[in-house]
Curated annotation (Swiss-Prot):
NCBIfam families: murC (TIGR01082). ATP binds at G110, A111, H112, G113, K114, T115, S116. It is found in: Cytoplasm. The gene is murC. GO terms for molecular function: ATP binding; UDP-N-acetylmuramate-L-alanine ligase activity. This is UDP-N-acetylmuramate--L-alanine ligase. One of its GO terms (biological process) is regulation of cell shape.
Length: 444
């Protein structure tokens, strides 16, 4: 029986993906959000899903309401109205926890690499069998007949605790979200609690010291590059400008050679995790091998475009570990080009906590340009950190730029520009694209 769903904060990456999935399953879907453009709304608009401004008139007692986790009575009129009038609603993660019970569910958790790995697993499995999925880049697919459900499992504020999937991958554990987690131990405890809820198989990166301490009632399979101590091992790596080729062994048994058209060592590990999970779940590895070859990536994860013969890469990287992985991927694909990083720090708390790590990561580039820190709606700028504090720690050529003047980026020949951040770094990217386009017009 089709239902009517209203999403409070429908442009959020998880929310938009869920809205698309429910829409494709035959339900009526609408939502509300701020008017500012966000990259997820294109998919919603293409699907014909109505996006409204926040207004208490949007709410109806006959609809099922799903609320974004950031919204509270003091910052959202719809939440305030619902609370005052006894209108029930579920948070995104609460809804998802009950929704997935109708499927064989496969989660992807981890401090970094969740979205790319969820996208890869969704791509392969949906080409093998009918599958519904939710990816953190705002992409969702729903099928009323699907047996399997693939989803991204987010650790922030322990949102993954309502989830009890049959299978899960955990890519890594790292200290992030310092506005919520107090320490690496706190992060570990959250992941360990989640791991205890997996029922059939847990796949963890075996070269992560924290993940080696994880416990679960489900069988734990380790994957990695090193033969000793890992169940699924990637070896014989060949990294080229067209992607990566590698061989996978399971406890000494050769599972064959695989190719992915994506870049960076981290993507080889993501693929090894996907191979391990699907092999253990009983899927034909020849089909897995075939469909890995066609996985082109997910939105805002090493997304490339060429403007006026200039290569521009857009990536969501906003943590030092992610920056290193993204720059490594850029060097693999463009070994003869200068790698120029354009980075916008995301949240003041993260910038303070990881300032030295950010500098170390950005020094992997040949030149670095910094945008002003993008503050989260959850925090207040007390003036404790400025982007210049990060700039002072970078030893490569560097400069702070504004969105109104990105012309310093033109000081490079034969360069690849890697724009990274989780805030509005894309406005800097678009400004640079307009500048490049105008150069072409002026020449003509």
């Amino acid at each position: 029986m089709p239902k009517t769903y209203h999403f409070i904060g429908i442009k959020g990456s998880g929310m938009s993906a869920l809205a698309l999935m429910l829409h494709q399953m035959g339900h009526k879907v609408q939502g509300s959000d701020v008017e500012k453009y966000y990259f997820t709304q294109r998919g919603l608009e293409q699907a014909g899903i109505t996006i409204l401004p926040f207004d208490e008139k949007n709410l109806d007692g006959d609809m099922e309401i799903i609320a974004g986790n950031a919204f509270r009575p003091d910052n959202n009129v719809e939440i305030a109205y619902a609370d005052q009038n006894g209108i029930s609603y579920k948070r995104y993660h609460e809804f998802l926890g009950s929704f997935m019970r109708d499927f064989v569910s496969m989660g992807v958790a981890g401090a970094h690499g969740k979205t790319s790995t969820t996208g890869m697993l969704s791509h392969v499995l949906s080409h093998i069998t009918d599958t519904s999925f939710l990816i953190g880049d705002g992409t969702g697919r729903g099928s009323a007949n699907a047996k399997y459900f693939v989803f991204e499992s987010d650790e922030y504020e322990r949102h993954f605790m309502p989830y009890h999937p049959e299978y899960s991958i955990i890519t890594n554990i790292d200290f992030d979200h310092p506005d919520y987690f107090t320490s690496l131990e706190d992060v570990f405890n959250a992941f360990n609690d989640y791991a205890k809820q997996i029922t059939k198989g847990l796949f963890v990166y075996g070269e992560d010291a924290e993940l080696r301490k994880i416990t679960s009632d489900a069988p734990i399979y380790y994957y990695g590059f090193e033969a000793e101590g890992n169940d699924f091992v990637a070896s014989d790596l060949l990294r080229s400008t067209t992607g990566s080729t590698f061989t996978v062994h399971f406890r000494g048994q050769n599972l064959g050679q695989f190719h992915i058209p994506t870049f960076g060592r981290h993507n080889i590990m993501n693929a090894t995790a996907v191979i391990g999970l699907l092999y253990t779940a009983g899927f034909d590895l020849n089909l897995v091998r075939e469909h890995l070859k066609t996985f082109s990536g997910v939105k805002r994860r090493f997304t490339e475009k060429i403007v006026n013969d200039t290569v521009i890469i857009d990536d969501f990287a906003h943590h030092p570990t992610e920056i290193i992985a993204t720059l490594d991927a850029a060097r693999q694909k463009y070994p003869s080009k200068e790698i120029v990083a354009v980075f916008q720090p995301h949240t003041f708390t993260r910038t303070i906590a990881l300032l030295d790590d950010f500098a170390h990561a950005l020094n992997q580039a040949d030149a670095v340009y910094l945008a002003q820190i993008y503050g989260s709606a959850r925090e207040v700028d007390h003036g404790d950190v400025k982007v210049e504090d990060l700039a002072n720690k970078i030893n490569k050529k560097h400069q702070v730029i504004t969105v109104e003047n990105v012309s310093p980026l033109l000081d490079h020949d034969n360069a690849v520009y890697v724009f990274m951040g989780a805030g509005d770094i894309q406005t800097y990217e678009y400004s640079f694209e307009r500048l490049l386009s105008n150069l072409t017009s002026n020449v003509q």
